[in-house]
C-alpha cells in the first residue's frame, strides 16, 4: 500500500481552512477560503432587512464554497493523487445551527423565506436568545432537572435549545416549516454524504443530550412551551453517533466538486475546539487545551463526571473515547484585541506602525512587552462579548479600571491581554476546586502562533507551563485524524483516535514557563480581578445590565419615532 493522506477542514468564524495531512501528521498543503458573506450582523444579504442587536448569522452557501475551493486547491498544491486520499473530516464552530426542510435545503435559500432572519444560519456568537436561555434555566432549576449541573448550572443562549425557542417565539412559521434543526457541521456532512447523522460532541455539549439519559424529558420541554413537547423526536431526530465514526462516503456529485473519488470515507462532524485536543496529541487527563482565536475554548479530560461552576459541559466520550470531556470558554479574546485596534487606537499609532512596516497589533505588543506586571496601573474585565465561563451571562459587558490622563494605548492593550489571562485563570481555578486536575496547558489557534507576550502572560497568570501546537491549523489536523479513524486500519488509517493522536499530534519544542516574580505580582492583580468579577458579575451591582437595557430601549424608541 502506497503513502496515504487525509483531509481535515476547519470551519471557523470568518473562513474555512482545508489541510492535507499524511498519516504521520505532516501537513502537505493547506488553503484558507474566506466566507464571501462573512458574519452577517447588520443587514440580511440581498435585502434591507435590519438585524437587531446581538444577532450573528451566516450564509450556508459559504460552507459549500469552502469544499469547492479549498479541497481542490490543496490537491493541486500538493500534487497528491485523489486515489491516495482515504478520508475527509470536518470541524465547525458550535453551536452554529440552521433550519432545513425535508430535503435538507436551508430555509434561507428558499425565496419565500429569504427576508426572514430566523431562516438563516445562526452563528455560535448569536446572543439574541438570552431571554429564552434565562427562562430555560429558571424552569430547569425549579424542576430540579438533573442535566443542569452538568452544564455548570446554566444553559447558554449560544446553544441549540435557546436558539430554537427564539425561532418559535419570534417566527413560528419558520419553526413550523423546519423539518430539522441541524448543527452546521452535521449539515455539511449531510451535503457530502447524503446521510443525516448527528455527532455526539455537539449533541452533548450544545443540545443537552446525555449518553446515558438522552435528551431532557418531554415534560421539561412542555414546561418550557407546549409547542416544544415533541421537539427531540421530531425536529431534533436522527441518529447520534460517536466521534471517529464513519458518517458515510462522498457522493458522486460532491466528489466531483471537491476533486476526490466517490466513496471516500467521511467522518462524522466535530466541534472546532474539541478536534484540537487530539491535534496537539492530548489523550489523557490533566492537560488543558486552549483553542485560542476570536474566543477561547478550554478542553480537559477527566476519569469521572464532576460538576464545575460555569463549565459549558461535561460529556462522556465527548472529546476522547473512554474519558469525560470537560469544556469551558471565554466569549471574546482575539475579538477584544481586534476591537481595540479597530476602534480605540489613535491615529498616531497606526501611522507609526505603518512607518515601521508592522501591524498595529505588533506595534502595541512590542511596546506593551516593555512593561512589568502591575506597571500599567490598569485592570480590566474581559466581558466585551459577555461571559461564557464561569458566569454564563451574555448581558455582562467590558470594564477597564485605572485610566489617567497619562494612560497610553500600549498600556490599555496590555491590560486587555492580562484580562483574558485572568479569565482563563478563573476557569482553571473552578476545575481544580471541583476535583478536576490541571497540571499543564496546551495552546493552539491563531493567537499562540504569533503573540509571545500573550502566552508569557498566560503562563505567569496561571503559574503553569504552556506548550504550543506545532500546527497553525490544529483543529483541521484533529479533524484529519478523525478522518483517518473513519477510513479504518484496513484502508491505511488508524483503529482509534488515541492511536491517531500518538502518531500525528505535534507540539513545538519551545514552551512558555512561568517567571516567579511575575507570578507573584499577577497573584495580587488576580485577587483584585476576582473582586471586580464577583461585584459586577454575581448580582451585587447589575449596572452593566441596566446600561445595556437602557441602550436597547432608547435605540428601539428612537427607531420607532423615525417611522413617524
From Swiss-Prot:
Keyword Nucleotidyltransferase: no
Metabolic or biological pathway: Carbohydrate degradation; L-arabinose degradation via L-ribulose; D-xylulose 5-phosphate from L-arabinose (bacterial route): step 2/3
InterPro entries (alphabetical): ATPase_NBD (IPR043129), Carb_kinase_FGGY (IPR000577), FGGY_C (IPR018485), FGGY_N (IPR018484), Ribulokinase (IPR005929)
CDD domains attached to this UniProt entry: ASKHA_NBD_FGGY_L-RBK (cd07781)
Gene Ontology molecular-function annotations: ATP binding; D-ribulokinase activity; ribulokinase activity
EC code(s) of this entry: 2.7.1.16
Catalytic activity: D-ribulose + ATP = D-ribulose 5-phosphate + ADP + H(+); L-ribulose + ATP = L-ribulose 5-phosphate + ADP + H(+)
Family the UniProt entry places it in: Belongs to the ribulokinase family.
Protein name: Ribulokinase
Amino acid at each position: 500500500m502506497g503513502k496515504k493522506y487525509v483531509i481535515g477542514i476547519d470551519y471557523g468564524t470568518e473562513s474555512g481552512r482545508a489541510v492535507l495531512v499524511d498519516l504521520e501528521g505532516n501537513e502537505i498543503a493547506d488553503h484558507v477560503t474566506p466566507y464571501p458573506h462573512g458574519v452577517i450582523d447588520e443587514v440580511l444579504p440581498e435585502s434591507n432587512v435590519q438585524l437587531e442587536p446581538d444577532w450573528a448569522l451566516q450564509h450556508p452557501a459559504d460552507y459549500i464554497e469552502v469544499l469547492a475551493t479549498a479541497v481542490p486547491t490543496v490537491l493541486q498544491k500538493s500534487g497528491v493523487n485523489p486515489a491516495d486520499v482515504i478520508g475527509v473530516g470536518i470541524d465547525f464552530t458550535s453551536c452554529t445551527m440552521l433550519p432545513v426542510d425535508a430535503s435538507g435545503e436551508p430555509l434561507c435559500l428558499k425565496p419565500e423565506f429569504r427576508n426572514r432572519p430566523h431562516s438563516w444560519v445562526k452563528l455560535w456568537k448569536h446572543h439574541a436568545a438570552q431571554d429564552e436561555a434565562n427562562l430555560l434555566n429558571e424552569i430547569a432549576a425549579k424542576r430540579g432537572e438533573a442535566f443542569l449541573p452538568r452544564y455548570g448550572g446554566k444553559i447558554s443562549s449560544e446553544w441549540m435549545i435557546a436558539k430554537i425557542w427564539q425561532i418559535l417565539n419570534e417566527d413560528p412559521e419558520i419553526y413550523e416549516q423546519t423539518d430539522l434543526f441541524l448543527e452546521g457541521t452535521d449539515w455539511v456532512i449531510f451535503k457530502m454524504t447524503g446521510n443525516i447523522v448527528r455527532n455526539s460532541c455537539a449533541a452533548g455539549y450544545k443540545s443537552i443530550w446525555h449518553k446515558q439519559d438522552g435528551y431532557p424529558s418531554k415534560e421539561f420541554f412542555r414546561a418550557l412551551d407546549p409547542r416544544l413537547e415533541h421537539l427531540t423526536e421530531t425536529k431534533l431526530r436522527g441518529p447520534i453517533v460517536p466521534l471517529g465514526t464513519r458518517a458515510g462516503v462522498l457522493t458522486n456529485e460532491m466528489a466531483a466538486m471537491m476533486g476526490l473519488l466517490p466513496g471516500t470515507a467521511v467522518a462524522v462532524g466535530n466541534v472546532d475546539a474539541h478536534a484540537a485536543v487530539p491535534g496537539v496529541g492530548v489523550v489523557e487527563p490533566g492537560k488543558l487545551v486552549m483553542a485560542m482565536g476570536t474566543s477561547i475554548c478550554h478542553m480537559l479530560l477527566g476519569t469521572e463526571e464532576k460538576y464545575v461552576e460555569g463549565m459549558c459541559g461535561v460529556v462522556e466520550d465527548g472529546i476522547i473515547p473512554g474519558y469525560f470531556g470537560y469544556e469551558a470558554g471565554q466569549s471574546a479574546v482575539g475579538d477584544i484585541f481586534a476591537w481595540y485596534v479597530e476602534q480605540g487606537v489613535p491615529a498616531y499609532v497606526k501611522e507609526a506602525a505603518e512607518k515601521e512596516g508592522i501591524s498595529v497589533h505588533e506595534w502595541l505588543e512590542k511596546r506593551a512587552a516593555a512593561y512589568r506586571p502591575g506597571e500599567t496601573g490598569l485592570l480590566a474585565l474581559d466581558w466585551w462579548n459577555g461571559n461564557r465561563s464561569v458566569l454564563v451571562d451574555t448581558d455582562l459587558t467590558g470594564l477597564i479600571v485605572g485610566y489617567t490622563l497619562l494612560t497610553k494605548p500600549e498600556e490599555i492593550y496590555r491590560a486587555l491581554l492580562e484580562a483574558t489571562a485572568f479569565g482563563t485563570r478563573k476557569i482553571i481555578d473552578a476545575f481544580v476546586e471541583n476535583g478536576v486536575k490541571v497540571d499543564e496547558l496546551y495552546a493552539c489557534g491563531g493567537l499562540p502562533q504569533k503573540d509571545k507576550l500573550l502566552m508569557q502572560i498566560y503562563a505567569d497568570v496561571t503559574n503553569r507551563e504552556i506548550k504550543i501546537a506545532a500546527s497553525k491549523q490544529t483543529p483541521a489536523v484533529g479533524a484529519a485524524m478523525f478522518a483517518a479513524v473513519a477510513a479504518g486500519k484496513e484502508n491505511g488509517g488508524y483503529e482509534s483516535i488515541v492511536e491517531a493522536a500518538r502518531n500525528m499530534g505535534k507540539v513545538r519544542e519551545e514552551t512558555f514557563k512561568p517567571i516567579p516574580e511575575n507570578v507573584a505580582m499577577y497573584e495580587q492583580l488576580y485577587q483584585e480581578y476576582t473582586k471586580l468579577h464577583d461585584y459586577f458579575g454575581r448580582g451585587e451591582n447589575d449596572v452593566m445590565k441596566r446600561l445595556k437595557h437602557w441602550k436597547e430601549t432608547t435605540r428601539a424608541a428612537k427607531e420607532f419615532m423615525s417611522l413617524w
